[in-house]
Regions:
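Alpha-helical transmembrane segments and their membrane-interface boundaries
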Residues: 1-139, 143-296, 300-304, 309-356
């Protein structure tokens, strides 16, 4: 394996390579790859976001962040269907992300929740044939981030036109990328057969719908609660529910990692913010994220970017308080939602004699 190939590896694999290296030279190469990979990703992310916000106005920054995450993922992870149906799935994603912010303009909350549920369910069904590959978490985050980041007053005809152009351009780019990287995979796997004929009642598909319903409920709830950053609670909720229902990760372990990671991240931010400007702390967090391979440490350094933005609005004590409270709230809501859902599923199965 040469140096360029090592830069393409995940941090978890790179750390394995470092431990298993047969020589100091090989170990040094993998260590350099780990840190340079993180640096290149951060630099590319900064350039990527600057270009998009320059060409399409700064209001499109949430879309720039999401499109960057999609680009990083699509290079390595497909949607699990034959290429023509994967491109259809990509179109569903782009359309849903275009429409999602405008749902908040609907006056009737129940109708808004129903539309969010349909859009998010469609995204999950189209991209997460194998939820363990992480697409459910990525696109669930993307949906939440865009919906929460775009207030009503930013939504107008000009914004819609620009967003449509932006998403169409990236739809074309990502379609080419999907074709080049994944056209030989899953040649006989149909999106429509998988959803409507084979697996509609599978446990994974049921949990996709459960997850989409919970997220939709939480999005609509923001209209009725006084919290400043309900988006953070939404991310914590999403992480707990998606990891449990779609990736078979124990919610207790994920909840502990989320809360401890948030607490450590906030403490570190308080200390570092005494010496480093907020903007640089966000970049530092991005660099650290690039070398993390566990959820807990990713949660720690995710705090840096989020707090760097919020601290400029509420001050460091206020931002830290909101961050801790919202994460604990999201984790508690996620655990409660899983508990209630499990009880309902068990009762339904008992009623229909499906315990076996």
């Amino acid at each position: 394996m040469d140096f360029y190939q090592s830069l393409q590896l995940d941090p978890f694999i790179l750390k394995q390579k470092i431990r298993e290296a047969a020589s100091k030279k090989e170990k040094c190469m993998y260590i350099c790859s780990l840190f340079l990979r993180s640096l290149f990703i951060v630099l590319f992310a900064i350039c990527f976001i600057i270009i998009i916000t320059t060409l399409f106005e700064s209001k499109h920054k949430p879309y720039a962040v999401v499109l960057f995450c999609m680009l990083m993922s699509i290079r390595f992870v497909d949607f699990g269907y034959k290429i023509s149906h994967s491109i259809i799935g990509l179109a569903i994603v782009m359309f849903s992300l275009l429409v999602a912010p405008y749902v908040q303009l609907i006056k009737w909350s129940v109708m808004g929740m129903l539309i969010h549920f349909i859009l998010l369910s469609s995204i999950l069904m189209a991209t997460a044939s194998d939820p363990k590959m992480g697409n459910a978490s990525l696109y669930g985050f993307s949906y939440l981030f865009i919906v929460y980041s775009l207030p009503k007053d930013s939504l107008n005809k000009n914004f819609f036109t620009q967003t449509s152009s932006l998403l169409f351009f990236f739809f074309c780019w990502f379609s080419v990328l999907l074709y080049r990287k994944h056209r030989e995979k899953n040649k006989d796997k149909s999106l429509f057969k998988e959803i409507f004929l084979k697996g509609m009642y599978s446990q994974e598909k049921i949990w996709m719908l459960i997850y989409a319903f919970g997220i939709s409920l939480l999005i609509v709830a923001r209209e009725y609660v006084p919290f400043q950053r309900l988006m953070w609670a939404g991310f914590a909720f999403s992480s707990i529910v998606s990891s449990y229902g779609l990736m078979s990760i124990g919610f207790k372990e994920r909840a502990v990692d989320r809360i401890i990671g948030s607490l450590i991240g906030c403490v570190l931010f308080i200390g570092i913010s005494q010496f480093i400007p907020f903007n640089w702390i966000g970049i530092l967090g991005g660099l650290a994220l690039g070398v993390c391979s566990t959820y807990r440490y990713k949660t720690v350094f995710n705090c840096f970017g989020a707090l760097a933005i919020t601290a400029s609005l509420f001050g460091v004590p206020g931002a830290v308080t909101i961050r801790i409270f919202e994460n604990i709230l999201g984790v508690c809501l996620g655990i409660m939602y899983i508990g209630v859902t499990e009880i309902l599923i068990r009762k339904i199965r008992e009623k229909h004699g499906l315990n076996h």
